[in-house]
């Protein structure tokens, strides 16, 4: 089965074609991604209206390129899949409407894919990973620990109660006057800094719950920087190094508890695995910390290639292909969802916002 996938949930416009054979093995036939970094850089973050307009301007030619790169015509694909949520509603509308139109014109089945499910299943495309396994999703919009039991069978073990990790990186970079996107900028500066200079907090470290929290760490960075104004270059590099070390330590504690939970629930699993996905997974320091953690706990550490860790359409096409193997197509009446939990059975997680408790 060959599936055309479309991804427009945030600030990457993407189209791809993936093939899934009868044995469940996958192959990427094409994977085209157009980043909007240049459009959003002047604002220091993603502007939803600009993102939606950029998707609308670029998506048709990206679909054409994906088909050309795969050597296929539209009628030769077997299904069309698109991200239906979660994400920025304007971008989701652009991708979903385009995918529905293509599916209707070519008379092909249509699959509405949860963006998080795309990340959750990528390791099955790249590594043929069997169920069950653990997924750590760390991106600008999400920080979650998910138990993946099967297609559509997910349990959220932990999530952030305030800020996503990628957001904490971006806000730290902006505070320190570093360029957008913030994650790579902080990582570059941290290479030259002293991670022991500032004693930044490790939120929730030592607690039995498996959730994450990064707002307190972000606040500590702001307070530290404010006390040092005017900042020297060395101050900036040391803050970045201390921030990154605190994140690595926090992740190791939170994820380590999830690894123990997995071994308790699946004591007979021959090859327990931790999959790391999302843009923050590109950070070499964090990857090294998690890889060492997996080695100590007897887990395989799996991180898909960088171009498949960040937002892309190959993961959406693959998730559509996995669903097509076992499920009926979705209706063309399906609507985009800006919020769409991967595990809808889980109770809401309550954190603290400016106006008090929030879900």
UniProtKB/Swiss-Prot annotation:
Residues 328-359 are annotated as: Disordered. InterPro entries: ATPase_NBD (IPR043129), Gcp-like_dom (IPR000905), KAE1/TsaD (IPR017861), TsaD (IPR022450). Substrate binds at residues 137-141, 170, 183, 283. Keywords: Acyltransferase, Cytoplasm, Iron, Metal-binding, Transferase, tRNA processing. It is an enzyme of class 2 (transferase). Its main location: cytoplasm. Its cofactor is Fe(2+). GO terms for cellular component: cytoplasm. It comes from the Bacteria. It is found in: Cytoplasm. Gene3D superfamilies: 3.30.420.40. It catalyses: L-threonylcarbamoyladenylate + adenosine(37) in tRNA = N(6)-L-threonylcarbamoyladenosine(37) in tRNA + AMP + H(+). One of its GO terms (molecular function) is iron ion binding. SUPFAM superfamilies: Actin-like ATPase domain. Binds 1 Fe(2+) ion per subunit. Fe cation binds at residues 115, 119, 311. It holds the Pfam family TsaD. The keyword Repeat does not apply. Belongs to the KAE1 / TsaD family. Required for the formation of a threonylcarbamoyl group on adenosine at position 37 (t(6)A37) in tRNAs that read codons beginning with adenine. Is involved in the transfer of the threonylcarbamoyl moiety of threonylcarbamoyl-AMP (TC-AMP) to the N6 group of A37, together with TsaE and TsaB. TsaD likely plays a direct catalytic role in this reaction. This is tRNA N6-adenosine threonylcarbamoyltransferase. It comes from Brucella ovis (strain ATCC 25840 / 63/290 / NCTC 10512). The lineage of its organism: Bacteria, Pseudomonadati, Pseudomonadota, Alphaproteobacteria, Hyphomicrobiales.
